Swiss-Prot record:
This protein is involved in the repair of mismatches in DNA. It is possible that it carries out the mismatch recognition step. This protein has a weak ATPase activity. ATP binds at G641, P642, N643, M644, A645, G646, K647, S648. HAMAP family: MutS. GO terms for molecular function: ATP binding; ATP-dependent DNA damage sensor activity; damaged DNA binding; mismatched DNA binding. This is DNA mismatch repair protein MutS. GO terms for biological process: mismatch repair. The keyword ATP-binding applies. CDD domains: ABC_MutS1 (cd03284). The gene is mutS.
């Protein structure tokens, strides 16, 4: 609606001046909940009030009328704002904070008693732009992302920034990998062009990934505009100052900087230039695999039971965030992986140093986020103190290394220790200026040390010794006048005054004594000196707070100039924390250093699942370790055996071992030789996707299709029960053909678990496939799951035994056994296997299927060479094929 329609709807012309001010500001922020500061409360009106009262659980009241209808209103105390903002941000609302820009007294002085206090929006808070500790998690990054998908290109540009830590990155992402990349980053908010609103991509982002999308008009991403924004923001003359970036990346970076500028108003973040990321530098793990393996969250989205919760024994907040990033993005460069492993091994070999360093790290603060708050004028004296204490502790950590090693530190350790050297200029600045007990709120005063500035000392002297100054002035006037009975008194009418008895009035001859009042018994005077003292006493508290704010802002500017140093220091501390953490868990849990090879080795001896092992240890139970020996000659393990025997755990543990190894950690195994894994795919279990109208089987097939399309020779595929969501013959056929495709086309490493025992004969003609099963012990009708993976194939699933363990009624179990016996007798009469092993052709079954004639479409496909088609020719051909298909 336009402004005239808006004014009419809300009765603008009949509203009070204050309400007109509210409506003016609200119209400029229609996409936000507007929190309007009125005294000690932030108020909301109309639809905002109705919505917020429900979300926040606060009372809905009324204020005035709009025509015949009362205006809904609700409010929250200003001092409790962050608590309420937390709820609004969790619900993905966009909130505009409208503050008073002057005091009521200043408004009266400006425009009389009817003047409305000046107000304006000082900040817009969105899920991707929060920096307050209460509004963000300590471990996960809080990314705002901008995704630019150019037309007729197969690569998108993605820029993502964490405002709370002042970090920003940009990466080119293959179009097929966009959802996987977003799943890696888990941005709280994604900027997307309006023309993509109805696209499948936008639908998948919001429904499948459940991420918030903020749409912007197409011009928001215009390349020329975005380039100018970047140049202005970083004060550069040439875009090459950022690095070699594409037009799409320019649009992604520029749009994020513009959005941050719009939402943060005057408090522009001090972001470094974007770090350009190579998409292929880290392992690809798709959305469903991250969910199945429970890498950073469990299957319900929580932390308990995730791989992160098991591995995270970091002692700093920034260390926890770095570990989260490591687990989200395992490396694919074996040289860099080994560099990390060297650091882990150093700390593992020097556990005495590790223990001392970890104790000191506990005393450091999250200076990344402290620095951001300071640079954006939302910091406090305590943030500065946190930086000072961290500088001091970092220096102590550095001394531990040099005390033990002197100058013989390994170069890779010296590199991360060197930034710990204390910046004395910065340390001394904070030490000399900020009170040790500085409050969070600058308005409370007491932030700046009295000794830091003479005026601060003078004002505090006035505040603390006001009566003493009055006494000194009284004694001075007694000497000057010779009147011993002279007093200095105070009342609410004339303030401070010199009080002299009437009989002594003739002794006042000095013109500096100004007559104020005569009473029956006394004459009252003042002096310029006394007036100044009174003014200073009255205003001292206000003046000292104002002066402290000025000095604090100057100190913050000087600290901000050291941003690069502080970021490097924070990075060093977080890295040391993570590698000490790796050493700690390795020593506590008997992990070993993995060895990386240039082939397809995946040779794990006595491997364990770290999360399951941790859970069993709490129950004082032991985890049964297993080997896994994949190689060029034996790329595929087909694993059969009963449910509950440990197949799924075995599949997951090997994928997890690959991830742990490639983040630079030791692994839960006796030994591990691994050929670098570029992608991990896991299809384990499935659930109906009712929102998208997909059955279990359709969801399973979509995941399997994506795996087969995106895997490379260096990938690791984990498949569990492919084909189980349909009829037996269909399921066996699909599982068979998938195995063949992986073996013959992809030629990558694969662990394939199945209940289709018919597949075990495939080792006769798939030379790189071997059968493995789960060892069990049978005693009559009872079975014992040994959880050991052994060579061989299972011929039974023992499903009825599992059903009995689950507590099904005995009558149901007995009946199931009778039915199973009949099926087994019938199968024996017809021949044990329905599958033919005599032929290696595409036909799975002994019964020959009727031959189908090729359709015209199939004949047409045979003539097409997709590598020689231009994008335009491919599109035209697609329309032609669609038309022919409809005719057929």
């Amino acid at each position: 609606m336009n402004f005239q329609e808006f004014k009419h709807k809300y009765g603008y012309d009949a509203a009070t001046k204050m309400m007109q001010q509210y409506l003016d500001i609200k119209f400029a922020h229609l996409d936000c909940l507007l929190l309007f500061r009125m005294g000690d409360f932030y108020e909301m009106f109309y639809e905002d009030a109705v919505l917020a009262s429900g979300v926040l659980g606060i009372a809905l009241t009324k204020r005035g009328k709009n025509g015949d209808e009362e205006v809904p209103m609700c409010g929250v105390p200003y001092h409790a704002l962050e608590n309420y903002l937390t709820k609004l941000i969790e619900e993905n609302y966009k909130v505009a904070i409208c503050d008073q820009l002057e005091t009521p007294e200043e408004a009266k002085n400006r425009g009389g008693y009817k003047a409305v206090v000046n107000r304006n929006v000082t900040r817009i808070i969105t899920p991707g732009t929060v920096i307050e500790e209460n509004l963000i998690t300590t471990v996960e990054p809080n990314y705002l992302a901008s995704l630019v998908v150019p037309k007729n290109k197969d690569t998108a540009a993605l820029c993502y920034a964490d405002l709370s830590t002042s970090t920003i990155f940009v990466v080119n992402v293959p179009e097929l990998e966009i959802l996987n990349e977003l799943a890696r980053l888990k941005p709280r908010e994604i900027l997307l062009s309006e023309h993509l609103r109805s696209s499948d991509l936008a639908s998948n982002i919001s429904k499948q990934l459940n991420f918030r999308i903020t749409y912007q008009v197409d011009s928001f991403f215009a390349v020329n505009k975005c380039e100018k924004i970047i140049l202005d923001f970083y004060k550069m003359k040439d875009i090459k100052g950022v690095g070699e970036i594409s037009n799409s990346q320019i649009c992604a970076i520029g749009s994020i900087l513009e959005y941050l500028t719009l939402t943060q108003k005057e408090n522009i973040p001090n972001l470094p230039k974007p770090k350009i990321i190579d998409f292929h530098s880290y392992m690809t793990i798709d959305f469903s695999t991250r969910r199945n393996l429970e890498i950073v969250t469990n299957s319900c989205g929580g932390n308990k039971g995730s791989l992160l919760s098991t591995l995270n024994h970091t002692v700093t907040k920034q260390g926890g965030r770095l570990l989260y990033n490591f687990l989200s993005s395992p490396l694919t460069d074996t040289h860099k992986i080994n560099q990390r492993l060297n650091i882990t091994e150093f700390f593992h070999s020097n556990l005495d140093i590790t223990a001392k360093v970890r104790e000191l790290l506990k005393k450091t603060s999250d200076i990344e986020r402290c620095l951001t708050r300071i640079t954006m004028n939302r910091g406090s004296g305590r943030d500065l103190l946190s930086i000072k204490y961290t500088l001091e502790t970092a220096n102590s950590i550095k001394e531990i290394f040099f005390d033990n090693y002197g100058f013989e530190l390994p170069s890779f350790i010296e590199k991360i220790v060197k930034p710990l050297i204390r910046n004395d200029e910065l340390y001394n600045l904070i030490e000399e200026s900020i009170c040790e007990d500085a409050p969070n709120n600058l308005n409370d005063g007491g932030v700046i040390k009295h000794s830091y500035h003479p005026k601060v000392l003078q004002l505090h002297d006035l505040i603390n010794n006001g009566k003493l100054h009055i006494e000194k002035l009284k004694d001075q006037y007694k000497k000057e006048t010779g009147i011993d009975s002279l007093k200095i008194s105070h009342n609410n009418v004339i303030g401070l005054f010199i009080d002299i008895t009437a009989k002594n009035a003739n002794k006042i001859n000095d013109p500096k004594f100004i007559h104020r009042q005569t009473t029956v018994n006394s004459v009252r005077y003042t002096t310029a000196e006394l007036q100044k003292l009174e003014s200073d006493l009255v205003n001292a508290k206000t003046l000292v707070v104002s002066l402290e704010k000025e000095l604090y802002e100057d100190i913050c500017k000087r600290v901000t100039k050291q941003s690069d140093y502080l970021r490097i220091l924070a990075s060093s501390l977080s890295g040391i924390d993570v590698f000490c953490n790796f050493a700690y868990i390795a020593s506590e849990n008997d992990y070993t250093r993995p060895e990386f090879t240039d082939d397809l080795s995946f040779d794990i001896v006595k491997g364990r699942h770290p999360v399951v092992e941790e859970a069993l240890n709490k129950e004082r139970k032991s985890f049964v370790h297993n080997d896994c020996h994949l190689s060029e000659a034996e790329r595929i393990w087909l694993i059969t055996g009963p449910n509950m025997a440990g197949k799924s755990t075995f599949l997951r543990q090997n994928a997890i071992i690959a991830i742990i190894a490639q983040i630079g950690s030791f692994v839960p195994a006796k030994s591990a030789r691994i050929g670098m894994v570029d992608k991990i795919f896991s299809r384990i279990g499935a659930a109906d996707d009712l929102i998208k109208g997909q059955s279990t089987f359709m969801a399973e097939m979509l995941e399997t299709s994506a795996i087969l399309a995106q895997s490379t020779k260096n990938s690791l595929i984990i498949l569990d029960e492919v084909g189980r969501g349909t009829s037996t013959y269909d399921g066996v056929s699909i599982a068979w053909s998938v195995l063949e495709y992986i073996h013959d086309k992809l030629k990558c490493r694969c662990l394939f678990a199945t209940h289709y025992h018919e597949l075990t004969i495939m080792d006769n003609f798939l030379p790189a496939m071997q059968n493995y099963t789960i060892a069990i012990e049978e005693s009559g009708k009872d079975i014992l799951f040994l959880h050991n993976i052994i060579a061989g194939a299972a011929d039974r699933s023992y499903g009825i035994h599992v059903a009995a363990l689950a507590g099904l009624p005995a009558s149901v179990i007995n009946r199931a056994e009778q039915i199973l016996l009949k099926f087994e007798k019938n199968a024996a009469g017809k021949g044990k296997n329905i599958l033919s092993t005599e032929s290696n052709n595409l036909s799975l079954f002994a019964i020959e299927s009727p031959k189908l004639q090729n359709s015209k479409l199939e004949e047409k496909f045979k003539t097409i060479d997709p590598d020689k088609l231009s994008p335009k020719e491919a599109l035209e051909l697609l329309y032609q094929l669609k038309s022919n298909f409809i005719k057929q």
